[in-house]
Amino acid sequence: MIHHSLVIPAYNETLLLPRLLDTVDAARAAYRHGADAIEVIVADNGSADATATLATARGCGVVSVEPRCIAAVRNAGAAMACGEILSFVDADSRVHPETFNAIDDALARPDVVGGATGVRLERWSLGIALTYLAIIPVVLLTGMDTGVVFCRRSDFHAVGGYDERRELAEDVVFLWALRRLGRQCGKRLTRLTHVKAIASMRKFDRHGDWHYFTKIIPGALPALLRPSARTELARRYWYTDDR
């Protein structure tokens, strides 16, 4: 019986998906309820490479999603899921061996609605360190984080999943909605910092180690004020083939 469904959004991920799946296999092997209680779903966003073929060969369920919208991709994966627990991780990440056990333990607590594992970074530099320092206060104040994001399937549907009207920050909006839902019944988001995922630095490799300060922050205000600027920022940063 499937207990836990892991959804992996993917677009042209033949290079990095195998190393993620290697770590997922290790986490499934360590799962106290057995590897067969975990299903892995790759939501393929119209890849031009062999992502779907690779995922199928590795035993993953595969769902094809046409719109270039990360929220729609995550939602399509969730719609295919059978587990009572849903989790989401990016294809360029790697997961900790105790991830699924830690998520089970967290959601067994009566005061937890969901959360995330947080991440460790593959490499550091001054620009990356300052970016991290700029972001971490928000994480600490809100309890929201990245890495492997998880919740009960019932709560995912209660908040409507990821907002497909949003071209960016849909993950933040989802966690805000989950947080609001939890507060209605005395629950909170949690961070599982003892099982952090490992995040790749490909955004920094492509855009530069200082790009949060030279591109993202300067582009944030226009993106808030003008839909066209928001679309262009999302396209350049998230939806290019060489992202």
Predicted feature residues:
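Short, well-formed alpha-helical segments that are part of the catalytic scaffolds
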Residues: 13-32
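A conserved acidic beta->alpha catalytic loop
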Residues: 23, 44-52, 93
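Short beta-strand/loop segment that forms part of the nucleotide-sugar
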Residues: 25, 32-46, 63
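Acidic donor-binding/catalytic loop of UDP-sugar-dependent glycosyltransferases
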Residues: 50, 89-106, 176
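Glycine-rich, basic loop-to-helix element that forms the pyrophosphate-binding segment
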Residues: 65-81
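Short aromatic/hydrophobic "clamp" motif used to bind/position activated sugar donors
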Residues: 86
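Conserved donor NDP-sugar-binding/catalytic core segment of glycosyltransferases
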Residues: 97-127
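A short, conserved alpha-helix in the catalytic core of glycosyltransferases
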Residues: 155-158, 166-186
